[in-house]
């Protein structure tokens, strides 16, 4: 994993409900923890675009519900600042479920994916239909 080029303001915290942007059968995910987060005592972990998070499936098919999985945040409502000065924000907060090798578990990704995610996770970029 490489560093992000954009200044990502983290718009999701622990407990946030986000939509699942792939076709694994999950529809809504709840953020449980953020991988690699080291913060102040008693502070909720924050996540932004391109971060790996541990999620619990709250809505979806009966086989997927209540599972604890790894996911990557691909969209967030909070604007992020790119090096050229532009700011990018999306309509919703969304994530893609991944496996142990950082490959997406689904075969298609619905909606746009941020360019920062595509640079960090090549397998998600190849599966995505639109990169913004």
From Swiss-Prot:
Name of the featured protein: Large ribosomal subunit protein uL14
Keyword tags: Ribonucleoprotein, Ribosomal protein, RNA-binding, rRNA-binding
Gene Ontology CC: one annotated term: cytosolic large ribosomal subunit
Similarity comment: Belongs to the universal ribosomal protein uL14 family.
SUPFAM superfamilies associated with the record: Ribosomal protein L14
GO molecular function: large ribosomal subunit rRNA binding; structural constituent of ribosome
Annotated signal peptide: none
HAMAP family: Ribosomal_uL14
Biological process terms in GO annotation: translation
UniProt keyword rRNA-binding, yes or no: yes
PROSITE patterns: RIBOSOMAL_L14 (PS00049)
InterPro entries (UniProt xref): Ribosomal_uL14 (IPR000218), Ribosomal_uL14_arc (IPR019971), Ribosomal_uL14_CS (IPR019972), Ribosomal_uL14_sf (IPR036853)
UniProt entry tagged with the keyword rRNA-binding: yes
Subunit structure: Part of the 50S ribosomal subunit. Forms a cluster with proteins L3 and L24e, part of which may contact the 16S rRNA in 2 intersubunit bridges.
